[in-house]
């Protein structure tokens, strides 16, 4: 992704689980490193599925990151000479991430955010809708529906093989749920 010279900007990579959001974030960060740009990658501390320290894609690609408890901590840990900032699992951050990302971009830095645009209910997730609104570049990518093989834009949460209910909590840490990519037609959220 190429942006204006001597200006900061925001990029968002959004989509359902298994669409390659983290792989795309890692790819963009690696390209910046090849170009000798200073990079820093942040992720929410609660994302410890594959690694506590690294951002790891489902395919196993990984890149070193700084786990943070809140979006405010990104500013505290951001180094002065960083050119490109990556933020994975942006949906798990609080709404102040939008203001923080804007502040960073306004200081002539490139910010790349990756995350789920919708929760398992098919509703906008965390700060992602606002990030997509203020970003200069937005890529909404799809996975493949596990039921019908059409393009998937939603994440289906399954508990013991059955769709999670609308009343279930949006974020479940360490629970025995699983996820599948689904298209609009095959996505189910029972009441």
UniProtKB/Swiss-Prot annotation:
Enzyme Commission number(s): 2.7.1.21
Ligand binding (ATP): 15-22, 88-91
Active site, UniProt feature: 89
Reactions catalysed, as given in the entry: thymidine + ATP = dTMP + ADP + H(+)
GO molecular function: ATP binding; thymidine kinase activity; zinc ion binding
Keywords associated with the record: ATP-binding, Cytoplasm, DNA synthesis, Kinase, Metal-binding, Nucleotide-binding, Transferase, Zinc
A GO term from the CC aspect: cytosol
Top-level taxon: Bacteria
Cellular location(s): Cytoplasm
Chain positions recorded as Zn(2+) binding sites: 145, 148, 183, 186
Keyword match Zinc: yes
GO biological process annotation, one example: DNA biosynthetic process
SUPFAM superfamilies for the chain: Glucocorticoid receptor-like (DNA-binding domain) (SSF57716), P-loop containing nucleoside triphosphate hydrolases (SSF52540)
EC category: transferase
SUBUNIT field: Homotetramer.
PANTHER family linked: THYMIDINE KINASE (PTHR11441), THYMIDINE KINASE, CYTOSOLIC (PTHR11441:SF0)
Family, per entry: Belongs to the thymidine kinase family.
Protein name: Thymidine kinase
Organism per entry: Clostridium botulinum (strain Loch Maree / Type A3)
């Amino acid at each position: 992704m190429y942006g204006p010279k001597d200006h900061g900007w925001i990029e968002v990579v959004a989509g359902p689980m298994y669409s390659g959001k983290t792989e795309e974030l890692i790819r963009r960060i690696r390209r910046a490193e090849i170009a000798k740009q200073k990079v820093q990658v942040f992720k929410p501390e609660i994302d410890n599925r594959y690694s506590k320290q690294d951002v790891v894609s489902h395919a196993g690609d990984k890149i070193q990151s700084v786990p943070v408890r809140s979006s405010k901590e990104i500013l505290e840990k951001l180094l002065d000479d960083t050119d490109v900032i990556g933020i994975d699992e942006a949906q798990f951050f609080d709404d102040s991430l939008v203001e923080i990302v804007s502040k960073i971009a306004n200081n002539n830095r490139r910010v790349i955010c990756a995350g789920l645009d919708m929760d398992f209910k098919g509703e906008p997730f965390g700060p992602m809708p606002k990030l997509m609104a203020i970003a200069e570049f937005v890529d909404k990518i799809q996975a493949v529906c596990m039921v019908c093989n059409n393009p998937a834009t939603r994440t289906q949460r399954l508990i013991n093989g059955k769709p999670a209910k609308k009343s279930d909590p949006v974020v479940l840490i360490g629970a025995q749920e699983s996820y599948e990519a689904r298209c609009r037609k095959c996505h189910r959220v029972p009441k």
